[in-house]
Amino acid sequence: MAQLNQNFIDTITQELPAHLSMDDFIAACDRPLRRSIRVNTLKISADDFKTLMQPKGWTFDPIPWCKDGFWISYDEEEQLGNALEHIQGLFYIQEASSMLPPTALFTPSAFTPSAKWQCVLDLASAPGSKTTQIAALMHNSGLLIANEYSASRVKVLHANVLRMGASHCALTHFDGRVFGEYLYESFDAVLIDAPCGGEGTVRKDADALKHWSLNDVLAISETQKALIESAFLALKPGGSLVYSTCTLNRLENQGVCEYLKQTYGDAVQFESLSDLFEGAERATTPEGFLHVWPQIYDSEGFFVAKLTKTASVPRLQPEPTLQKNFPFTPATTKQAQGIKDYFQQDLGISLPDDLIMVRDDEFWLFPHEFRDFIGRMRFQRIGIKLADSTKHGFKVRHEAIIALAGKQLSPTAKTVDLSDVEAKEYLMGRDISLNTAVKAQGEVIVCYGGAPLGMAKHLGNRLKNNLPRDLVKDKVLLLSEQIKSL
């Protein structure tokens, strides 16, 4: 049972909309969340994913605000994170409400008729659900900078970006309050899913509100105000900003947005989200924000606001000096052609027309748009590592296969499709015996369900596993008999 602090109840009773009841709110807080996932369209379409999973007993209940999101039901004794298709990056386990902010950011409106952003900032990214959703909405084009303040969470973010095949990301590790200074008016769109009190998460954490206090809310709202101001300064004139939290009180939600409006006046134009999806008006505030109480859509509590920056505003700090000693250099024409030929001729992959960069013996692929950000900030990770140069040519990197060996594959690519049992063995680091001995084929891409798992060396009678050791799993779940129909 949810532990609802009486001070929280007293505060939220005053803020609950007139058409909602406190009894329904408390009852909703005690109900477990429906399980939800988002299909990763960077690797597979929603329709193809359904076709893949229906023989395994899956049924799909669509989430109205995310065309690739679905509620599912499964045996809760099993860890869905160990599922073969999850490890493969075909889907992300994501709470339905958290799919709202990217949808709001990329939905055209009266103020933003086109959502084809080239440079997007996700200011507080980890663990990566919204980052990878944005990457899918951008179709792995343009540049997505994903920032995370917590060092340990940067590692989780990086792992999820790689697993989902998001190739046009650059990761940073900074306090989000510096972006308005370092990358002033640089982004077409900014998402800030702000750190918050987490009041909306009580359905998955019964103790989330046990120690709630107004002083904590006031303190965190000051941080949120600084973050939204930094995000606004980093936004180009004419760009869109979405501010979201998984909390419910006005101080952390409407109060933060009102602070920005009071500070920058007419440069801040709120956009109504009442038409974002069918039924959105049930959660729309007078300002046009979405204030999602858990009983409205049987989901987590959430808040989403969207605004347009209608004019440039003065920067608060002088432009910082450009940093020197960037460790990457553009590949020479000969180097670039060599790596392109290797990918095309040996792997059957056509490299995208992006920046091929070199660091020592490493070849990397950067988004073209990253060129304008060189020297302006320190980055933890940029784009994808393609290959290492060796005495005998190149050795492809696993992350390049995961990101590029889907829609980029040519019909002549050397691939081997595995059964689910074989795919499980592969992900557990084991070699795969072949039923029929044939001529050895060298490096091949192993796939399951039409999406790549990694590389192997075809030795004629078996596939020698080339999965990086740090990605080998102790347990891989086959879902054939685990998912229950709704």
Curated annotation (Swiss-Prot):
Predominant localisation class: cytoplasm
PROSITE patterns, per database record: SAM_MT_RSMB_NOP
Name of the protein: Ribosomal RNA small subunit methyltransferase F
Encoding gene per record: rsmF
Keywords of the record: Cytoplasm, Methyltransferase, RNA-binding, rRNA processing, S-adenosyl-L-methionine, Transferase
Entry annotated with the keyword Cytoplasm: yes
Active site per database record: C246
EC number per UniProt: 2.1.1.178
